[in-house]
């Protein structure tokens, strides 16, 4: 942790020469207490606050630039700041993560920087009190909701699936199933049974799963009607927001009761709450078998939302990220069942390898686009909740500027590698370093806003 703090202090000292790379103080209690730089007089006024969750390593540094150079010069918004950097999570016994989630419940919109989920090596590196849980998991457990991942499409970035000309958004039901299962190894012959004992005192129900003639493995897993219903509401509301059709995939032909329950709950909620709205937007909802859906996705041009059970969503979201070209061009939004509360972030991690180079004083070429889109998706949603068309227009303009900047040929090394191959790319010929790329986006944004 000491090394982490030294780097941040050195960055703060460097800011005196006009550098845009000084991150916020690691334990700043509230962003509003931090000094403001020279912002425009005619910034877009935002009536209600946005929760800001700061993060770790290279993304933390980029996050500060985005906020100070791309967002706040144009948007007058009160940011409820929470430092989710690993040192502060450890210092507060992870209470800061809980507080940030509760603030999101209160204010309905949060933007989050990528954070470290510590393993044993990180516990040693930061001298942590304990191995703290994933902040994303903690936030999801408090807010509920569904994580939707959506690619950012740039025409000049090759796709492994060339036919995907429109985005495909995956909604993963991040609750239960294999991820909360009880699994075990059987070392001898015997009978595997599952028993359900009702709380009302009525007799238990028992199912025989398998008679093992010898060793093997077994598993028991579950989900709840409440969680499946929340998942369904989030998916239907997200599809309406995007004005895209929604597909839900299961294997209900095999898991007739388990996956059949997902299918039945989705259909009932659709008929009761959303069919009229879907018809109005000329979009539709369909259930598909997972194997049929995978085949259809590969053949499609995109432009839909795909609701997946937990394991399917885990696997298919990574396939989509690679199929569209880069995890650095993937957004992630947690949408709660109330249809009002969201938390937006980049789909990638803290870019540790680049941060190690940055600590040594070496320039990096780190892709900031997904982090920028975390801000824009959060601000756009704030604008929709508040009826603030200027804020919506700003968020959409910044997203358009990012895409057009890449399509004009200015990009970071990861994207240049998608086009030319990583071994063939050269700095300033095929790609820019991090600061130059961000400065290019800033110049293009200022120009685009000046033309409105």
From Swiss-Prot:
SMART domains: Iso_dh
Binding note for cofactor: Binds 1 Mg(2+) or Mn(2+) ion per subunit.
Keyword hit for Magnesium: yes
Biological role stated in the UniProt entry: Plays a role in intermediary metabolism and energy production. It may tightly associate or interact with the pyruvate dehydrogenase complex.
EC number: 1.1.1.42
Protein name: Isocitrate dehydrogenase [NADP], mitochondrial
Modified residues (N6-succinyllysine): 80, 106, 166, 180, 193, 256, 282, 384
Main location: mitochondrion
Modification comment: Acetylation at Lys-413 dramatically reduces catalytic activity. Deacetylated by SIRT3.
InterPro entries: IsoCit/isopropylmalate_DH_CS, Isocitrate_DH_NADP, IsoPropMal-DH-like_dom
Top-level EC class as recorded in UniProt: oxidoreductase
Annotated localization: Mitochondrion
The gene coding this protein: IDH2
Transit peptide limits: 1-39
Family membership noted in the UniProt record: Belongs to the isocitrate and isopropylmalate dehydrogenases family.
Cystine pairings recorded for this chain: none
Source organism: Bos taurus
A Gene Ontology term for the protein's cellular component: mitochondrion
GO molecular function, one term: magnesium ion binding
GO biological process: 2-oxoglutarate metabolic process; glyoxylate cycle; isocitrate metabolic process; NADP metabolic process; tricarboxylic acid cycle
SUPFAM superfamilies listed in its UniProt record: Isocitrate/Isopropylmalate dehydrogenase-like (SSF53659)
Chain positions recorded as D-threo-isocitrate binding sites: 117, 134-140, 149, 172
Binding site for Mn(2+): 291, 314
Cofactor(s) needed: Mg(2+); Mn(2+)
Binding-site positions, NADP(+): 115-117, 122, 299, 349-354, 367
N6-acetyllysine modification, residue list: 45, 48, 67, 69, 80, 106, 155, 166, 180, 193, 199, 256, 263, 272, 275, 280, 282, 384, 400, 413, 442
Domain of life (superkingdom): Eukaryota
